[in-house]
UniProtKB/Swiss-Prot annotation:
Cofactor or coenzyme needed: Mg(2+)
Identification of the protein by name: Ribonucleoside-diphosphate reductase large subunit
Gene: OPG080
PANTHER family: RIBONUCLEOSIDE-DIPHOSPHATE REDUCTASE LARGE CHAIN, RIBONUCLEOSIDE-DIPHOSPHATE REDUCTASE LARGE SUBUNIT
UniProt enzyme class: oxidoreductase
Similarity-based family: Belongs to the ribonucleoside diphosphate reductase large chain family.
Binding, dTTP: D226, S227, I228, K243, R256
CDD domains: RNR_I
Effect recorded for E764K: In strain: Garcia-1966
Pfam families assigned to the protein according to its UniProt record, in alphabetical order: ATP-cone, Ribonuc_red_lgC, Ribonuc_red_lgN
Amino acid sequence: MFVIKRNGYKENVMFDKITSRIRKLCYGLNTDHIDPIKIAMKVIQGIYNGVTTVELDTLTAEIAATCTTQHPDYAILAARIAVSNLHKETKKLFSEVMKDLFNYVNPKNGKHSPIISSITMDVVNKYKDKLNSVIIYERDFSYNYFGFKTLEKSYLLKINNKIVERPQHMLMRVAVGIHQWDIDSAIETYNLLSEKWFTHASPTLFNAGTSRHQMSSCFLLNMMDDSIEGIYDTLKRCALISKMAGGIGLSISNIRASGSYISGTNGASNGIIPMLRVYNNTARYIDQGGNKRPGVMTIYLEPWHSDIMAFLDLKKNTGNEEHRTRDLFIALWIPDLFMKRVKDDGEWSLMCPDECPGLDNVWGDEFERLYTLYEREKRYKSIIKARVVWKAIIESQIETGTPFILYKDACNKKSNQQNLGTIKCSNLCTEIIQYADANEVAVCNLASIALNMFVIDGQFDFLKLKDVVKVIVRNLNKIIDINYYPIPEAEISNKRHRPIGIGVQGLADAFILLNYPFDSLEAQDLNKKIFETIYYGALEASCELAEKEGPYDTYVGSYASNGILQYDLWNVVPSDLWNWEPLKDKIRTYGLRNSLLVAPMPTASTAQILGNNESVEPYTSNIYTRRVLSGEFQVVNPHLLRVLTERKLWNDEIKNRIMVDGGSIQNTNLPEDIKRVYKTIWEIPQKTIIKMAADRGAFIDQSQSMNIHIADPSYSKLTSMHFYGWSLGLKTGMYYLRTKPASAPIQFTLDKDKIKPLVVCDSEICTSCSG
């Protein structure tokens, strides 16, 4: 049997050569548990005559990855094999790769079509020796298999569908793309990115340094006008943003309801549903453009709008397709008055914004005055019990996981952009709270901090966290100035108000590394101190930028300009971790360069790249399934697998019991200290999750994407959760509702004979990668 090498030559397949290649990549791994010979034997069984070395490496990596239930180091080995394969297929020098990307010629028309920008190329040409010398390619080998495969699939740049970038090339491209001629800052950013202290958001990783450097994640729009012109002009804005893979939040509360009079045609309006079908089809059309991450929209509506009941049905699984929008997400922008009426079992008046104008433009007491005025004047379309609307909201959430819930009054009352006007919606993922109007489209650039990295020698390093936050602020602030904006209204807004969004990933990993149960008092205290540090560091960096460059244009009149910070708006006194009064004095003197700073977002893709748990979430399971070309296999929480392996508690019976129990270890005979630390989200009281969100909320000047997890949701459970979050002053009451299926799928992958009453075995576990 022969293999075809990269140079086209044939060579006999040699078992020893395969084993040797695997063994070379096992440096630093736990050799008590990693068995290169077993992997090589499985590879030999899976190859065919004429297999290429690239295919051989791919198969070897996948086989190693399937062994991750034996030991987490197998995931690192799998990644090393895949990375080694990529290194053999790509050029080493960063400058050479950038030159190839810049010199790209479209094969269909023969035209020069540079993939990276001319300024990026100019910077690389001037500093190529320095940039080439500081790149450390060994850091590519630190990714786990799934992180690396995520990079391969969507992030590393390609020429004619062939990957030409290595992960380190991508990170240096991002750093140079942001900092351009400031080469020292570029190298500082590169090192922090490649050491995994933080990551920029996906659009920045995709596009920094390229010819279309659209690096922003979030765009917030209001419907420009309740007219054909306004609706379709807004649709065009959405299409142009979606084309550049931006996520959209759109407020439609000013669009007249169904049955309302249209003076121009002497007819009646069809309401928001047919209009949203048009938006839905636009989202589907843009989706066909081959974007790495197609743009999607969340539609925001206030619950007084008389089309509210039809709106709540938009994503349901049954009903007339003409009344469904499967490709849009829906969210409610809820005033406090509605929550009070639900609580008091009061009546709720449904209104048309054409006949009851201005409700979307006011909040708090002013909203209540205007709304009750319209009620007294009997301008409403209909009156129903507030709890009828509430029940429809809960039913929709139980069936579809949506609508998302945000509290209009908290969002406006606690915003440092309150001086700009009424904020009418959030973004796609409910963590961005920014002002927009007909002439301005709000934008936000994001990055997330890998909190697990700051657990050093059993302690959390707050000083290092503050230092990294300050680098992120400077980076995101630069992106505002150099970004490619899909529409001019976005550029106007972003350069006037200069908001940024700093989030986190790996909070659960940090707790585990410190041996803190997620719901422990120690974890709750650390949660507060982490976000206090992030907010402090972000303010300090933004103030230092303002000292050099001046405050943002609309700073005067903001809360911060009057010495009021986010925690003041929550009536919270910070800990003594940082000295806040001198910082407040400095802000009074120099101002801030950025209107908003902190916004914990979902981090699904980037957390997978870095091998961390998502955002501020606990682990949802301790075991889950991954699919690769060669089939499906199980992956175990690497922290749990490592501790069980070290304590000689890991075996097939444990693995099978965890799988039978849907990723839980609570029904095992494992030690109690392990059970406490490795509770899943389903085993942690949701009120604790909500309380921790409120605790950190005092240091989050935008908002946070907070999911609610209830295995078997009911009207009473969900109502209790929502009212608890509202009473604590949360801005985002709920992103998704996550539930468990009514019945678990049959566990075909398990050997039923092996599922016995669990007894922890203290004997040596098998160290080979057995099938």
